[in-house]
Amino acid sequence: MMEEGRKEEPEERGEKSTMRDLLQRAVDKGHLTAREALDRWTLEDHGEIHPWIILFCFAGAIGVIGGWGLRGELNVCMLIVLVVLVPIYWGIGEAARNIDSLDWKWIRKVFIVIIFVLVGLLGGCSAQRQHVAMLLSPPGIRLPSTVDIPWFCISNAPIPDCVHWTVQKPDQKHQQIENVMELQEVLDNATFFEVPDLFDRVYLELARLDANSTGVPVNIPPTGISQVKGDCSTGDIQGMNETLSTRGTLGERTFLSIRPGGWFTNTTVWFCVHWPFGFIQRKENLSEGSAQVRNCLDPINVTEPRVANYSYCPLEYKGKNYINKGLKCVGGRVDLSSNPEQHTDLLACGTFCQNFRNCDMVSRDILIGYHPSQQKQHIYINHTFWEQANTQWILVQVPNYGFVPVPDTERPWKGGKPRGKRAVGMVIFLLVLAIMAMTASVTAAATLVKQHATAQVVGRLSTNLTYITKIQNQYLHLFQNLNTRVNNLHHRVTYLEFLAEVHEVQTGLGCVPRGRYCHFDWRPEEVGLNMTLWNSTTWQQWMSYYDQIEENIWNLKYNWSEALEKGKSNTDGLEPDVFRYLADLSSSFTWGSWVDKLVWLAYILLAYFAFKVLQCIMSNLGAQTRYQLLNAQEDTDPAGDGDQPDDHRSGDTPRSGVPSGGWSQKLSEGKKIGCLILRTEWQNWRNDLRTLRWLTLGGKILQLPLSLLVLLVRILLHILSPTFQNQRGWTVGRKGTGGDDRELSPELEYLSWTGSSQEMVEMRDLKEEDIPEEGIRPVEM
């Protein structure tokens, strides 16, 4: 193959040199003009690529790469465009080799228009902005920053599953929280963490639900001392959660320490709630008789009511801090065995521990302040409040949806197949049928047993009554179990109703009730979303903040709809034209649209050529009016000697400006040239197919439409070139009747006289020495 390629190169060079010699010989002999020889050489594919073509190719490639950079992603469509541009640019480059400088007058205009369109499109691309998105189901809170939120757990179950909290040590829990925080820092674009789905409407029933269905709260074991620091008002309460265990008849249960930032955990239903209460005053800021407890949701004022059972443990006394001393509560009092040197100080202020039912607790877990001026009057918590805290589990409402800023390039998450509706009504109906069937069966069994006992001896009546009592007990136990299951079903249905309300709100805002985000067209500052307030607001304030943002979005949508209706009423009747224009604009980069543009371009070219033809015809008609035929009297010799010029015959008037004879010959020559060019191109195609030159053949296939257009332009220019010169006042004709019929080159063309016949006779009779040096000046049109 290499040898064949080397052989082909000299052959091609020889063909080029032979073609050049033949054209030069034809020009020397006068068979071809210089213009025709140049056209023949150009049509033989020996041209070069024009710089405008190279600039256009580079502009298109830079536009594609620039669009890629603005979007920030490389999709399949962009790859297809890059791959398709290579053969297109190749074909344009190959077609440019056959275009001379005269044909670039209209091609340059097309390129300039295309470049302006590309510049306008690139200039219209806006920078990336942010818009507001609503977090959709599953309900939860997104961690927008690395703030230490005091509670969260990761779960995928419909009911929160916090099992991993019960089997880990405190250090492991904190390590897990840190790992999640680090993961959140790595991710971006609204990373979503699912938190416990705390029910909004179920307050007491689900929290107190237990295996024995008695509703009696489980006693809390001793908690010891927790190291607590921070302030609940800013959400910075931190500390070590202590895992505690107790065994009883109901199985093993695990609880976290009761303190600000701690948790209650009931392993029966695996339900996590937050204990948010704690004193927020410090020793320096306390005033006598006033103290405030805050739960990070709502402040609670605590006074000094009369109580029967209370005690305290100071956080700080006489400038000494006892927080990190490891004190324990033994027998209702503080164990001072580990700190004997401070025994006196603690006894001076009272070393009692809070009596919480039958379980002792160190009150330091609740952050009790101490007033230094009056040692006998201490700040304590209302006993009724303690009973309420022990009886009812306190639930923290978790926002089921929120608003976050996301970039404009973020695409909505396309969810999978939606989950089917649960047949809750069918389950309830089946339960009712089961209850009725079981009731009927139990009643029938009791009746049969009673009839059988009556038919038997009277002595077995007591045994039958015993059997009936057992059946009634079993029936009662069955209804207790059914009650428990119906309660569970009630909680699930209540939660689904709440989710339905949330989805209704989301649907009203134009959101799909599934997926990850619901994208809006407004920026965060337009709806009033400020994520910097996260660390300085409580949960209740944050929920009201969400309500305000939701109201702002409703107002924006309402204003937008009103503006749309107003604009629609103002532009009534113009919508179809606007939509049609937008549709045409959106389809401006499709192949079909460019074909339409080429058709219009062909129409414009045909109109231009028709205009030129009419202009040439008018010019020829104007030139024809300047001719005057000589009659018999004017043909005679002015001197009366009867001699006539030898080279002037009665039928040979210089009427070469008339287009009838010249145009037919031009048309035949143009037809011959076109056939010659097409025959040459077909021979080249056959050679490429025979030698399997697929690269050259592919370029020629791509440049075929443009080559045909260029061929048409060349034929028209060849036909109309004499007419263009007629517009300047000259008429192109033949050298004479006695000479050959070939057309001379443009440098040696014979110029016909456009004056009167009398002037022509006078000029003919002049001798060569009488002709002025500057020659005969033609008459300007």
UniProtKB/Swiss-Prot annotation:
Residues 423-443 are annotated as: Fusion peptide. It holds the Pfam family BIV_Env. The mature envelope protein (Env) consists of a trimer of SU-TM heterodimers attached by non-covalent interactions or by a labile interchain disulfide bond. Residues 482-498 are annotated as: Immunosuppression. Specific enzymatic cleavages in vivo yield mature proteins. Envelope glycoproteins are synthesized as an inactive precursor that is N-glycosylated and processed likely by host cell furin or by a furin-like protease in the Golgi to yield the mature SU and TM proteins. The cleavage site between SU and TM requires the minimal sequence [KR]-X-[KR]-R. This is Envelope glycoprotein. The chain crosses the membrane at residues 598-618. Residues 634-644 have a biased composition (Acidic residues). One of its GO terms (biological process) is symbiont entry into host cell. Residues 634-666 are annotated as: Disordered. One of its GO terms (cellular component) is viral envelope. Residues 1-597 are extracellular. Glycans are attached at N189, N212, N241, N266, N285, N301, N309, N382, N464, N530, N535, N559. Residues 619-781 are cytoplasmic. It comes from the Viruses. One of its GO terms (molecular function) is structural molecule activity. The keyword Cell cycle does not apply. The record marks R422, A423 as: Cleavage. The surface protein (SU) attaches the virus to the host cell by binding to its receptor. This interaction triggers the refolding of the transmembrane protein (TM) and is thought to activate its fusogenic potential by unmasking its fusion peptide. Fusion occurs at the host cell plasma membrane. Keywords: Cleavage on pair of basic residues, Coiled coil, Disulfide bond, Glycoprotein, Host cell membrane, Host membrane, Host-virus interaction, Membrane, Transmembrane, Transmembrane helix, Viral attachment to host cell, Viral envelope protein, Virion, Virus entry into host cell.
